Amino acid sequence: MRFLTQQTIVIVFTSVFMLSTSLASEHNHDTPPQTDSLLNEGKKWKIDSSLHEGMNRIKHSMQSKVSAIHDKTFEPEQYKALAAEIDMHLTYLFENCKLSKDADAQLHVLLFKVIEGKEQMRASTEQRAGAVTIIKTLQLYPKYFDDKNWQPLQH
């Protein structure tokens, strides 16, 4: 996996996630594909240190730019640079995070939203909406994952 670029890893992850969601919905036509995270029988999912680290990296990247994003003074090239930063943090998560199968599936729901936001920031339109998607996802993370050291994004 060392030889794959970050972008390739993200594309493969996204494709596998979308395909598995599609295949799951083919087998059960009564249940829509999962787009929201779920709790673990009413409890938050256990994490490992790399999940905390990776999510913290994403949060810190967003934190330093949130005022400019909020004030609509963040420039298109800055969004693209931020998307590249988020890419690096996602790669770290994909390479290092070791969760239980069920917790990992729930994490993928959240990370898919981060990927969507990152891709919007990379595009020439709706860049701010992409950043907002990531900010909202960071706000959801502690609702579903038991990260006792998590500090919320300040904005």
Which ranges hold each PLM region?
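Non-transmembrane, amphipathic alpha-helical segments
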Residues: 39-54, 71-78, 99, 106, ...
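Bacterial N-terminal signal peptides
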Residues: 10-20
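Bacterial N-terminal signal peptides that target proteins for export
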Residues: 1-11
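Short, solvent-exposed, charged loop/turn and helix-capping segments
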Residues: 89-108
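Immediate post-signal-peptide N-terminus of mature secreted/exported proteins
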Residues: 24-74, 153
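Helix-rich interaction surfaces within compact, conserved domain-sized segments
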Residues: 96, 107-155
